[in-house]
């Protein structure tokens, strides 16, 4: 009889967002008249912009003609998109990349999971707490951990608490680690990292022969010119870091699916016999074996983001969401709620009212306000007592949700 991958059985029951969905569906079934406003999972609400949509349509039309039809594309991505990203998104930061160092994908969630294919299982991994669940769960699935303890920490992973006391920025691990997940602007806390803070991590990684897995999915929401958009703005980072980016929130591609990974040529790991080997070559080999590339229409649409008009439209949507963040942050703060994030990041991280756990507050908002958020404890034990709200909602719904919450908390 075929055996299963028992590592999946170590996972806590239900991925965070499906559990939220289950509770919301149950509430909606019991209260069909209720207008539920969802500010939980970070899905966007604004449509694709006209320039992006036209590029999409034109690319689909290309597939309708024998003369312009496109079949299998390059697994690494089309040069027209890679070149546009390097020219428009990295060069202005002072970061020079080769086209061979960038890989286009169908989204950064997949990349954050798939990157584990090129790392040995006996590497020691450090992740933040609270953390985007994908970092934690994919390491469990692949077999890098033991079982979870009563708090939810998995044996074999090093957890770095990100708390109110340390400004939601992790301290360096006391033990030796080989791989470090960093996400800035952060999901779920909305915290950002200064260049000096990132330099500290780069210096740490170089000194300890560690690799940083840097998730920059929300870099487009940074407005403070002093906050770095890429870890490669720090000298030496190409020798110790892989960077992930996404079009999901930046350009509304949550249903379109497109992302990218940067694996610098300078980045090397060690083989089992102690020799150095290129991670770039390993990732290329992995992609050419397991991935056929993001679709041609998707990559054409993504490239349109970097045209002058395309970026103007994209920035307008980003501004729309950041205004939502301001409304949530200032509205709840005025109601006496302690809030973090929502500046340079599209997530608001708030403290739950005294005496309420994260899931208690979830149920309170759902039942009393008909508003859905995300319990902080779902992101890790250090998230207990906190709650995440997303700025990706429709403006009218955001305003109404904030008013409902304020009214309820004043009772």
Swiss-Prot record:
The keyword Protein transport does not apply. Pyridoxal 5'-phosphate binds at residues 72, 108-109, 132, 187, 218, 246-248, 257, 292. One of its GO terms (molecular function) is L,L-diaminopimelate aminotransferase activity. Substrate binds at residues 15, 42, 109, 132, 187, 292, 388. Its cofactor is pyridoxal 5'-phosphate. InterPro entries: Aminotransferase_I/II_large, DapL/ALD1, PyrdxlP-dep_Trfase, PyrdxlP-dep_Trfase_major, PyrdxlP-dep_Trfase_small. Involved in the synthesis of meso-diaminopimelate (m-DAP or DL-DAP), required for both lysine and peptidoglycan biosynthesis. Catalyzes the direct conversion of tetrahydrodipicolinate to LL-diaminopimelate. This is LL-diaminopimelate aminotransferase. GO terms for biological process: lysine biosynthetic process via diaminopimelate. Belongs to the class-I pyridoxal-phosphate-dependent aminotransferase family. LL-diaminopimelate aminotransferase subfamily. It catalyses: (2S,6S)-2,6-diaminopimelate + 2-oxoglutarate = (S)-2,3,4,5-tetrahydrodipicolinate + L-glutamate + H2O + H(+). Keywords: Aminotransferase, Pyridoxal phosphate, Transferase.
């Amino acid at each position: 009889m075929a055996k299963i991958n028992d590592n999946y059985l170590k996972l806590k029951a239900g991925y965070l967002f499906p559990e939220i969905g289950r509770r919301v569906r149950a509430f909606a079934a019991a209260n069909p008249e209720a207008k539920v406003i969802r500010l939980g999972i970070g899905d966007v609400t604004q449509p694709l912009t006209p320039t992006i949509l036209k590029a999409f349509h034109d690319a689909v039309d290309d597939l309708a003609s024998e003369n312009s039809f496109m079949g299998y594309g390059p697994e690494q991505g089309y040069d027209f998109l890679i070149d546009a990203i390097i020219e428009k998104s990295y060069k202005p930061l002072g970061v020079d990349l080769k086209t061979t160092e960038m890989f286009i994908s169908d989204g950064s969630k997949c990349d954050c999971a798939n990157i584990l294919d090129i790392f040995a299982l006996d590497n020691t991994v450090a992740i933040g707490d609270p953390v985007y669940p994908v970092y934690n769960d994919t390491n469990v699935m692949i077999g890098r951990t033991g079982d979870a303890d009563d708090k939810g920490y998995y044996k074999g992973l090093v957890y770095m608490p990100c708390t109110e006391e340390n400004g939601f920025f992790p301290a360096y691990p006391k033990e030796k680690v080989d791989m470090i997940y960093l996400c800035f602007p952060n999901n779920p806390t909305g915290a950002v990292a200064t260049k000096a803070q990132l330099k500290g991590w780069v210096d740490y990684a170089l000194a300890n022969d560690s690799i940083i897995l840097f998730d920059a999915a929300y870099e487009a929401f940074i407005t403070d010119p002093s906050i770095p958009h890429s870890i490669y703005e720090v000298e030496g980072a190409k020798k110790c870091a892989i960077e992930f980016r996404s079009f999901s929130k930046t350009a509304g591609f949550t249903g379109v699916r497109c992302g990218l990974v940067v694996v610098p040529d300078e980045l090397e790991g060690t083989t089992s016999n102690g020799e150095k080997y290129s991670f770039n070559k390993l990732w290329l080999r992995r992609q050419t074996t397991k991935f056929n590339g993001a679709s041609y229409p998707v990559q054409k649409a993504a490239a349109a983001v970097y045209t002058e008009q395309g970026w103007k439209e994209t920035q307008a949507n980003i501004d729309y969401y950041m205004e939502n963040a301001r409304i949530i942050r200032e509205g709840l703060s005025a109601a006496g709620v302690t809030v973090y994030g929502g500046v340079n990041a599209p997530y608001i991280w708030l403290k739950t009212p005294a005496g309420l756990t994260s899931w208690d507050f979830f149920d309170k908002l759902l039942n009393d306000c008909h508003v859905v958020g995300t319990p902080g404890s779902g992101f890790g034990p250090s998230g207990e007592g906190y709650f995440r709200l997303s700025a990706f909602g429709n403006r009218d719904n955001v305003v109404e949700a904030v008013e409902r919450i304020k009214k309820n908390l004043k009772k």
